[in-house]
């Protein structure tokens, strides 16, 4: 497994792979890897000849400096996990390598609408940072496919739109959420939970599933469903942050023409902001 930290060396390797006619898959990450990331790697390996995993804690997508400062950096452990998975190449650049003149004056990519709605409304600049770094990685790695987790549902929708709008010749693969046995979606942010909070955390998925059951049973008073869900979260020990029920294909509000709904939930548990989602077919 090659570990590359600079752009010239990365370009050199990508040119070699292209000359050899290899099919390349990219798995972009911020490190602190868990089994959910490994599922992305496995999906990439099944679809390509060569797998490139990027590990970069992107300062442009953090709306709070304290979140950036405390985000776990575990490069050595991450590389050991990826090596066991037989990943071909890890790209782990420094911030200086990606943003030599800082982020303030760096050219950015923005996806209108999707970047400022829902999660984007509560985290200004977050999705602009995501679309900028992902487009930069696409340009550098030139992958045939790229794998992203469905846990970050809005992010996946944003990347799909960016790829379509910008004409990237890349297949975007959404990989289903990986959960612990108790239902909690795997996330790097779960590491912020205390032992006691970890016992409470599966309640998020229980509330999410309760909303899904109501929708599948034909209930359509969305305001009431959301209000009850928020109350249930608070009673379980969470601080409900945002609950949305949207058209899964457009992320707009549910209409009579909507065929699928996505339930998007965000809640604080101690210092961890947990997100999860679930799709529901509408009768």
Swiss-Prot record:
Chain sites annotated for binding (R)-pantoate: 61, 155
Pathways per UniProt: Cofactor biosynthesis; (R)-pantothenate biosynthesis; (R)-pantothenate from (R)-pantoate and beta-alanine: step 1/1
Residues where ATP binds: 30-37, 149-152, 186-189
CC annotations in GO: cytosol
Reaction catalysis annotation: (R)-pantoate + beta-alanine + ATP = (R)-pantothenate + AMP + diphosphate + H(+)
BP GO terms, sorted: pantothenate biosynthetic process
Keyword annotations: ATP-binding, Cytoplasm, Ligase, Nucleotide-binding, Pantothenate biosynthesis
CDD domains the record matches: PanC (cd00560)
Binding site for beta-alanine: 61
Active site: residue positions: 37 (proton donor)
GO function terms (MF aspect): ATP binding; pantoate-beta-alanine ligase activity
Pfam entry (one): Pantoate_ligase
Functional description taken from the UniProt entry: Catalyzes the condensation of pantoate with beta-alanine in an ATP-dependent reaction via a pantoyl-adenylate intermediate.
PANTHER family to which the protein is assigned, alphabetical: CYTIDYLATE KINASE/PANTOATE-BETA-ALANINE LIGASE (PTHR21299), PANTOATE--BETA-ALANINE LIGASE (PTHR21299:SF1)
Assembly: Homodimer.
Family designation: Belongs to the pantothenate synthetase family.
Protein name, UniProt field: Pantothenate synthetase
Gene behind the chain: panC
